[in-house]
Structures are given as structure tokens and as C-alpha cells.
């Protein structure tokens, strides 16, 4: 008997899709590589690749963590009601105030996720 493993869908928020195109190719490539783990393991994926973002309005807000192009990258994402991981916003936290970095990342992620959830309810 064989069991097929369910893959988790990973999608980009429309604003993040535009930002992704502006990232250095090395960062894009590494993010795409990290997305494979999200697809494979879904919400079971934990540290060091994924951690919960504390301070978000959403208890399921996470950060995908990786290094690329001499940077320390974080990509905020959450699982939506359709059980998809939606990537919301990214940032390089190398060389900046950690408190300020996370405040801005979480603010954008929460705003985008809120807008996204509202658009799902309108469909």
C-alpha cells in the first residue's frame, strides 16, 4: 500500500509578488528553495526555518528565516482559511535595529493579511 504525501500550497500576496521581482536573484533563488520545505511540511515546519512572529494581530503569523546575498532574510507569512501559506512581505534584518525591523515587518504583514482575508470574504 502506498500513501501519497499531501503538498501544501504556497502563494504570494499580490504586493509581495511585485516586491519579489525586485529582490536580488540570489535571494529569490534561496526563497524559492525554502518554499519547498513549506510545501512539504506545512505548519509542522519549525525552527530554524520557521518561527512564530510575536506581536502580530494574528496568532498564526510566521516568519520564514534564511540567509542570502550577505543578508539575514525574513519573510512573513500566514496560513489562510484555504490552508495555503501566503507570503506577505520580506525584509533583510542585517545591520538594522531588530525592534524597528520587526515592528515594520509585522505591521505590513498584518495589513496585507487583513486585506487578503477581506478579499476572500468578498468572493
Residues of each region from the PLM?
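Basic, Lys/Arg-enriched alpha-helical interface segments
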Residues: 1-72, 81-85, 92-123
Amino acid at each position: 500500500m502506498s500513501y501519497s504525501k499531501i503538498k501544501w500550497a504556497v502563494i504570494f500576496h499580490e504586493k509581495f509578488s511585485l516586491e519579489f521581482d525586485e529582490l536580488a536573484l540570489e535571494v529569490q533563488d534561496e526563497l524559492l528553495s525554502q518554499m519547498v520545505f513549506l510545501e512539504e511540511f506545512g505548519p509542522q515546519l519549525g525552527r530554524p526555518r520557521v518561527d512564530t512572529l510575536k506581536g502580530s494581530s494574528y496568532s498564526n503569523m510566521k516568519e520564514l528565516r534564511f540567509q542570502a546575498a550577505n543578508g539575514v532574510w525574513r519573510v512573513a507569512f500566514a496560513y489562510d482559511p484555504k490552508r495555503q501559506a501566503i507570503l506577505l512581505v520580506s525584509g533583510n534584518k542585517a545591520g538594522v535595529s531588530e525592534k524597528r525591523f520587526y515592528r515594520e515587518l509585522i505591521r505590513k504583514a498584518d495589513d496585507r493579511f487583513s486585506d487578503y482575508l477581506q478579499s476572500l470574504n468578498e468572493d
